[in-house]
């Protein structure tokens, strides 16, 4: 009798979104009887350990990217860190070769970690960003896409967490004119939450995440405005594993982190959500059809594009961080005519992808058994 398939799941460490969107993926792998190993560190590892304490965790150093304090400085900050990023990609590739041999890995699912592919093991890249946005216009987009596809095409497959029909939730990011050569599966939006009946309690929910120092800068900006706002607020800082909380007014309930179950309850009770325009956050808000105010990270071209796309379809009210006023934003949201995408069978693409992966593993195991016989 064959042993359970051993699947390595490795999320990127830019904020918490890559880890949270791996949760429904891991759930389905476990339902299919797989033995799941997780490669991560820091906040992403802590979040997944909270949800899945039974899994096997391997330490893998993240890219540890830090953003600039200003939008204009972000491009320069990323450029300075590029040599270290390329070194990290090379290092994780070498790490994977050792890990596959040591633990008998049958397949790798990498969420935006570009060095985690292996010549002898089926390797999947999960990304919604096929078209990377730049500040250089269409020529810059095309040049970066060509370089990006060189990385993507090293994998055996690419899974895109969005609807297959354009424009989807991510617009041109996930539905570019030209696609990579590797087989592509649109998973549908990935959310750790299940649609349910809201039990509104008329508070504003603040959900923070994202790389530093921008997470802290937005937190400080919002905390400074809470006294003058005055309405009930649940403030989730997005800092799993952190001890200690800042002082806040009596009408504010502040927490460092909430697990998936508690966060779903918090979302269903909120009349309005304030968060970054991170794509994983967008998927979760659309799954629950929650009204939101989204604040793109300054200088982050992907989030700037997403903000324009979401505003165009009226999926969210998106406002810049510079000059953001909490009370005025809530008033604008009350007048905003929200619409939401039609909820489809969101797990069908994910089920297809996982079952296809397991079929390939099974075929490989049978071929190896025949060869050894």
Feature-to-residue mapping (PLM):
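A nucleotide-sugar donor-handling region in carbohydrate enzymes
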Residues: 134-213, 237-241
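Conserved nucleotide-sugar donor-binding subdomain of glycosyltransferases
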Residues: 74-115
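A short, glycine/small-residue-rich beta-strand->loop->alpha-helix junction that serves as a flexible
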Residues: 11-23, 213-216
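Donor-nucleotide binding loops and adjacent catalytic segments primarily
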Residues: 26, 174, 188-272, 282
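Conserved nucleotide-sugar phosphate-binding/catalytic loop shared by glycosyltransferases and other
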Residues: 3-6, 13, 31-32, 36-82, ...
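C-terminal amphipathic helix plus adjacent low-complexity
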Residues: 327-373
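A donor-sugar binding/catalytic signature common to diverse glycosyltransferases
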Residues: 263-305
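Active-site proximal beta-strand in glycosyltransferases
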Residues: 119-135
